[in-house]
Design a protein with these regions (language model features):
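Short, hydrophobic/proline-enriched secondary-structure or compact coil segments at domain edges
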Residues: 55-69
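An amphipathic, hydrophobic-aromatic interaction surface with interspersed Lys/Arg
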Residues: 1-41, 52, 67-155
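Alpha-helical oligomerization segments
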Residues: 142-180
Length: 180
């Protein structure tokens, strides 16, 4: 969970001809499947694309991420660039210690990832719906781990087996100081 503080501000209200002062507001945010689904249902387009979001779309995603109750809508008008950058850094965090080491890089799927597709993966992999509130990158890692662990073991070619055995034998020879 991310906590950001929108600082207090002072500005001139042209309509009322007076200075207006706003109090600082602390928001609790979570980048989750729930917030992704809310945003996609409002904008009717996928959030997880390489396309830049407009300021309006970004601010609306912050609204969708908000866990704090009873936040006045005008509070979001006072988000600073620093607040937006902090949210973007949080969205990019892996939120897990799991790392994947792939033997061969295959070209990525061209399938567009939407909230419904992620829910489908959760159902297929028997991931409980409580996980929809996790940080999205942590959920993606769990989905990937479940997918990898549910696959049948990979069959190795004869060449790969011989190469692995040769490496193991060389390591044992070195460890035990023998010639074979």
């Amino acid at each position: 969970m991310l906590r950001i503080t929108i600082p207090s501000t002072e500005f001139w209200d042209e309509a009322k001809q007076e200075f207006v002062y706003t109090k600082a507001q602390t928001l609790q945010l979570e980048h989750s499947l729930v917030s992704l689904s809310k945003w996609e249902s409002r904008w009717n387009k996928p959030f997880l694309t390489k396309q830049e979001k407009t300021l309006e779309e970004t601010v609306d995603y912050v609204k969708c991420m908000t866990l704090t109750q009873n936040v006045k809508p005008e509070v979001y008008n006072y988000l600073t660039n620093s607040n937006i950058n902090e949210v973007n850094r949080y969205i990019a965090l892996p939120m897990t210690a799991t790392q994947f080491f792939e033997e061969k890089k295959s070209p990525g799927s061209k399938e567009q990832i939407t909230a419904e597709l992620v829910y489908y993966w959760m159902i297929v992999l028997n991931i409980p719906f409580e996980c929809q509130k996790w940080h999205l990158n942590k959920l993606f890692t769990l989905i990937r781990v479940c997918d990898i662990k549910s696959r049948p073991p990979k069959k190795h070619s004869r060449r790969e087996i011989m190469k692995r055995n040769a490496a193991l034998n060389a390591a044992r020879k070195k460890k035990w100081n023998t010639k074979g």
